[in-house]
Amino acid sequence: METYPKAKRHLEYVAFFDFELSTMEGPAHVFLAVDAYSQFAFNLGVEPDKKPESVLKNIYFLTENEEFVRYMENGFTLVLGEYEELSDRINAIIRPVNGKLLFSKSFNSYLSNPVLISFRDSLMHRKRKE
């Protein structure tokens, strides 16, 4: 079993990820981030696609989020499981605000899975009530 670093402060590691929902208009990609230390989930936006512009826009939205800004003076590491081809453009967004970039699919999954499982469980619970 792989071991991962344990966050010792807010925003030390922040997983950025998305999941797809089906809608009447077609797929919708929900972009989220989660702070490994607090487990706080940032709801960044919903886009019709995962094009580079959509990904970059939502990373920018993260750096402007009020809760995120509150803790970013000590820097942050953005953990992504994909989008390596956008690394230069992502760094252009996060470096000026004291951010670093880490690509690790397994670490990203480790950090994001609790949020995704909680979301799934919430939907299933809601469905059972109907």
How should each PLM-predicted stretch be described?
Residues 78-82, 87-130:
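RNase H-like two-metal-ion nuclease catalytic core shared by retroviral integrases
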Residues 1-30:
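Mobile-element integrase/transposase regions
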Residues 16-17, 34, 80-83:
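Short His-Asn-centered micro-motif
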Residues 37-40:
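Short, glycine-anchored, charge-dense loop/turn motifs used at functional sites
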Residues 1-6, 65-66, 87-91:
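Intrinsically disordered, low-complexity boundary segments flanking structured domains
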Residues 44-70:
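Active-site beta-loop-alpha junctions of metal-dependent nucleic acid enzymes
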Residues 73-77:
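Short active-site oxyanion
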Residues 20-24, 48-50, 83-87:
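Short acidic, S/G/P-rich loop/turn micro-motifs used as interaction or catalytic elements
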